[in-house]
Design a protein with these regions (language model features):
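Glycine-rich, small/polar surface segments that engage phosphate groups of diverse ligands
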Residues: 1-67
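Short glycine/serine/threonine-rich phosphate/pyrophosphate-binding segments
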Residues: 10-15, 81-88
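Short beta->alpha connector loops at strand-helix junctions that form conserved
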Residues: 40, 77, 103, 118-126
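Glycine-centered short loops/turns at secondary-structure junctions
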Residues: 70, 96-97
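Short, well-ordered beta-strand core segments
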Residues: 73, 99, 117-118
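Short, glycine/polar-rich helix-capping loops at beta-to-alpha or helix-loop-helix junctions
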Residues: 102-114
């Protein structure tokens, strides 16, 4: 399964993309659902973890409970330095779980813990987010094309 995470606009992108992988990207494409989940979608879990542990662990705790060896963690961060995304990427790497980073700028600290890095070389948050969605939609459309052949 795909496990997405991100903060703010990147959290919205994580939810958006998880839904499209699970349901579909294009209205006339009928394909099997792909297992995907956003770690940024459950406000009770996010706030309980932030309160009881620390905000830097809000993705790590659920990932530890839900992830399996064949999963893929997709971290989305326009700075590449979001501590909670960095912590879960490091943990995934330590467990030999594949990691993909949708990153901005030079990739920040997160780039060192991503098997695949999709970096947008900009410091403009809006442009980075637009490029992240474009890239993610392109990848999903390609996957859907393969699934319906």
């Amino acid at each position: 399964k795909l496990l997405f995470c991100g903060n703010g606009g990147s959290a919205a992108d994580a939810q958006h993309l998880a839904a499209e992988y699970l349901i579909r990207l294009r209205p006339k494409v009928n394909r099997r659902p792909l297992p995907a989940l956003s770690l940024a979608q459950d406000t009770s879990t996010l706030t309980a973890c932030g309160n009881d542990y620390d905000f830097s662990n809000i993705f790590l705790r659920p990932f530890q409970a839900l992830a399996s060896k064949n999963d893929i963690l997709i971290g989305i961060t326009t700075s590449g330095n979001s501590l909670n995304v960095l912590k879960v990427l490091k943990y995934a790497r330590s467990k030999k779980i594949s990691t993909i980073g949708f990153l901005g700028g030079a990739g920040g600290k997160c780039k060192n813990f991503c098997d695949i890095k999709l970096m947008v070389p900009s410091d403009n948050t809006a442009r980075i987010q637009e490029c992240h969605i474009f890239l993610a939609h392109f990848i999903l459309q390609s996957a859907e094309d393969l699934l319906i052949k």
